[in-house]
Amino acid sequence: MIKQRTLKRIVQATGVGLHTGKKVTLTLRPAPANTGVIYRRTDLNPPVDFPADAKSVRDTMLCTCLVNEHDVRISTVEHLNAALAGLGIDNIVIEVNAPEIPIMDGSAAPFVYLLLDAGIDELNCAKKFVRIKETVRVEDGDKWAEFKPYNGFSLDFTIDFNHPAIDSSNQRYAMNFSADAFMRQISRARTFGFMRDIEYLQSRGLCLGGSFDCAIVVDDYRVLNEDGLRFEDEFVRHKMLDAIGDLFMCGHNIIGAFIAYKSGHALNNKLLQAVLAKQEAWEYVTFQDDAELPLTFKAPSAVLA
């Protein structure tokens, strides 16, 4: 049986909030089977829980937020959510003593290291996947994203940025997803932004944690970070990282093919909601026999060591 996963032990880290620029303490806790992914703000009294849910997602200019029925929000969840998807973590409680998850280095890699440090435990309960049965597509002007049936999880993402720092040959990235491929090829890709936007936001008291330490920063011509890029195509790899996190907001790894053109958080979420709203387009599946599981989701030894 393919089993649900949680953490072996509690781990903690500190980082800076993208919005406030203040120190944030992040605590990751194991959770029982069928808990799902729960984000929790402990700076509120009593603490407020935000279960990962496609319907709770709001896309703001700076990040992805989860918002509850009282309009309370937790911000900057997308990169940690991508790390959970990458390692197939089904059950976890994520606590922060702030309104936001720390931005760390702007990628998912610090969260991957933290999760691996906690260790990953299998629970004696079948892991539920969402399997795509019919093609579903959403559009917004010339942007689009779609899911097709496929026995695995593949992603094919194209961006179209007209910028000298982004070579036209580095605007598409495609991969067959696996925990190993996610860790090596995607998790280290950082978010990016324009220097002028960061300066403008900071002049208005926003994005106070934004810096060269947590993003690729560009002007109109070039990358301004001293160390340059981690990958030649880091921009499109990061957009794929975002998509992996966005699509895991249903709380389950997805079996299907994802293809997108110029998509972002809002359109990724619109696609996920469109799939879930169309009952005949998907189904929950479990795997009693390991041999039936798509190769994509076989855990590498590093994950379950």
Curated annotation (Swiss-Prot):
<dbReference type="InterPro" id="IPR004463">
    <property type="entry name" value="UDP-acyl_GlcNac_deAcase"/>
</dbReference>
<dbReference type="InterPro" id="IPR020568">
    <property type="entry name" value="Ribosomal_Su5_D2-typ_SF"/>
</dbReference>
<protein>
    <recommendedName>
        <fullName>UDP-3-O-acyl-N-acetylglucosamine deacetylase</fullName>
        <ecNumber>3.5.1.108</ecNumber>
    </recommendedName>
</protein>
<dbReference type="GO" id="GO:0009245">
    <property type="term" value="P:lipid A biosynthetic process"/>
</dbReference>
<dbReference type="GO" id="GO:0046872">
    <property type="term" value="F:metal ion binding"/>
</dbReference>
<keyword id="KW-0443">Lipid metabolism</keyword>
<keyword id="KW-0862">Zinc</keyword>
<dbReference type="Pfam" id="PF03331">
    <property type="entry name" value="LpxC"/>
</dbReference>
<feature type="active site" description="Proton donor">
    <location>
        <position position="265"/>
    </location>
</feature>
<comment type="similarity">
    <text>Belongs to the LpxC family.</text>
</comment>
<keyword id="KW-0444">Lipid biosynthesis</keyword>
<dbReference type="InterPro" id="IPR011334">
    <property type="entry name" value="UDP-acyl_GlcNac_deAcase_C"/>
</dbReference>
<keyword id="KW-0479">Metal-binding</keyword>
<keyword id="KW-0441">Lipid A biosynthesis</keyword>
<feature type="binding site">
    <location>
        <position position="79"/>
    </location>
    <ligand>
        <name>Zn(2+)</name>
    </ligand>
</feature>
<keyword id="KW-0378">Hydrolase</keyword>
<feature type="binding site">
    <location>
        <position position="242"/>
    </location>
    <ligand>
        <name>Zn(2+)</name>
    </ligand>
</feature>
<dbReference type="GO" id="GO:0016020">
    <property type="term" value="C:membrane"/>
</dbReference>
<comment type="function">
    <text>Catalyzes the hydrolysis of UDP-3-O-myristoyl-N-acetylglucosamine to form UDP-3-O-myristoylglucosamine and acetate, the committed step in lipid A biosynthesis.</text>
</comment>
<dbReference type="GO" id="GO:0103117">
    <property type="term" value="F:UDP-3-O-acyl-N-acetylglucosamine deacetylase activity"/>
</dbReference>
<feature type="binding site">
    <location>
        <position position="238"/>
    </location>
    <ligand>
        <name>Zn(2+)</name>
    </ligand>
</feature>
<comment type="pathway">
    <text>Glycolipid biosynthesis; lipid IV(A) biosynthesis; lipid IV(A) from (3R)-3-hydroxytetradecanoyl-[acyl-carrier-protein] and UDP-N-acetyl-alpha-D-glucosamine: step 2/6.</text>
</comment>
<dbReference type="InterPro" id="IPR015870">
    <property type="entry name" value="UDP-acyl_N-AcGlcN_deAcase_N"/>
</dbReference>
